[in-house]
Amino acid sequence: MNFLAHLHLAHLAESSLSGNLLADFVRGNPEESFPPDVVAGIHMHRRIDVLTDNLPEVREAREWFRSETRRVAPITLDVMWDHFLSRHWSQLSPDFPLQEFVCYAREQVMTILPDSPPRFINLNNYLWSEQWLVRYRDMDFIQNVLNGMASRRPRLDALRDSWYDLDAHYDALETRFWQFYPRMMAQASHKAL
């Protein structure tokens, strides 16, 4: 899962949106650095990452990547799941329009920015103003996201080419998303994530 899915599942679970978004920017034990609700959100994010990576649908999708891009498949798939969530938001969350959800999420996250790591602050400078969560529905934007990650981290250069794997397996990936994401939504709503 990437930013949008983590925020969405956190909302459904009544967990800290801030902690769920912050988690990738925190190493080790967050308990001494953040309030309990944010810590709980960080832990939820980590559980979701482990759960998602081990879902049969996700493991199968990783195998569809070519040998030269398979190493970055988990990252590429995380971004792609956000694409499908953004694209199908009105079906998955009909009572909370995506643009309203993005404003709500931003308000929640802004409360922790003063005490956040610089890389997280930097992300927030772009995430909200450039409407990333809404733009995830556009595959051209997904390609830009993958290229941007590859540019910032040379060891992840294969992300540029992983775009072709997404394109080649788009329909099958969308089918897998519909197989697992509604289950995760139900788990979140029952606070079972």
Swiss-Prot record:
The keyword Lipid biosynthesis applies. It comes from the Bacteria. It catalyses: holo-[ACP] + H2O = apo-[ACP] + (R)-4'-phosphopantetheine + H(+). The keyword Zinc-finger does not apply. GO terms for biological process: fatty acid biosynthetic process. It is an enzyme of class 3 (hydrolase). GO terms for molecular function: [acyl-carrier-protein] phosphodiesterase activity. It holds the Pfam family ACP_PD. InterPro entries: ACP_PD (IPR007431), ACP_phosphodiesterase_gpbac (IPR023491). Coiled coil: none annotated. Keywords: Fatty acid biosynthesis, Fatty acid metabolism, Hydrolase, Lipid biosynthesis, Lipid metabolism. Its EC number is 3.1.4.14. Belongs to the AcpH family. Converts holo-ACP to apo-ACP by hydrolytic cleavage of the phosphopantetheine prosthetic group from ACP. This is Acyl carrier protein phosphodiesterase. It comes from Escherichia coli O139:H28 (strain E24377A / ETEC).
